[in-house]
């Protein structure tokens, strides 16, 4: 679902939508989707205006390039439970259980490694986030809730079990939402593998994603500006940047 004001610039990338629902996609007025190719498996879509470059319907979509390839963490035993953070904070990799609140204006530095999130989530209220060589793994329907006025620069590891993976989740989860609210800018490098999630980019969200592949159940753009370059081409031809499962 692409709502008014959304501007997605992925000129070197492909977007594949597996849905065969009626409609399989909705493009509302005042929107722009620029992609090397946007392939929608279903034949029924709603176009209320906007610009969609290289849009195809009833086409053959690519398979999930990462299905069954991302390992589960070696341990999901809790290391940290129900914390509150304020001010300048440096946090360590580990298993985070329950809800962890990052209060307004927190400046958060994440050390390299894997952050397993379970039985709750992280509630982020403003501030600056910096993390190189990090992976967020959701062991259940837990999430990170990015609220207003967050600025984040996050990149995936360049080696190891989670090489190139910025976000991943346990296989077979029931559907849930993952929301990026009004922010001051996200720069994300790596794969977002969230096949159970309805990912929502809300008003005035801005994101710049380098070397990215995104796999999501559904995506909703609300007045969002997102610039993407591709990461993972898989075993087939061409470059695949985003894949929607339903």
Cite the ranges covered by each PLM segment.
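Compositional signature of intrinsically disordered, low-complexity segments enriched in polar residues
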Residues: 1-246
């Amino acid at each position: 679902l692409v709502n008014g004001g959304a501007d997605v610039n992925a000129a070197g990338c492909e977007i594949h939508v597996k849905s065969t629902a009626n409609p399989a996609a909705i493009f509302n007025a005042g929107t722009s989707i620029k992609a090397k190719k946007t392939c929608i498996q279903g034949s029924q879509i709603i176009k209320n205006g906007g610009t969609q470059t290289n849009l195809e319907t009833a086409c053959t979509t690519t398979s999930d390039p990462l299905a069954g390839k991302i390992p589960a963490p070696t341990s999901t035993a809790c290391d940290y439970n129900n914390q509150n953070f304020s001010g300048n904070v440096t946090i360590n990799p580990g298993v985070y259980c329950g809800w962890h609140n990052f209060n307004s204006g927190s400046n958060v530095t994440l050390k390299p490694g894997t952050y397993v999130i379970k039985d709750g989530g992280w509630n982020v209220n403003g501030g600056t986030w910096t993390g190189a060589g990090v992976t967020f793994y959701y062991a259940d329907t837990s999430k990170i809730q990015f609220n207003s006025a967050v600025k984040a620069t996050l990149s995936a590891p360049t080696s190891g079990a989670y090489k190139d993976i910025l976000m991943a989740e346990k296989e077979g989860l029931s559907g849930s939402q993952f929301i990026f609210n009004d922010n001051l800018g996200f720069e994300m490098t790596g794969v977002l593998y969230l096949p159970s999630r309805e990912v929502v980019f809300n008003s005035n969200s801005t994101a710049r994603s380098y070397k990215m592949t995104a796999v999501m159940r559904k995506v909703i753009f609300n007045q969002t500006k997102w610039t993407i370059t591709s990461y993972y081409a898989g075993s087939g031809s061409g470059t695949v940047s985003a894949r929607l499962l339903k």
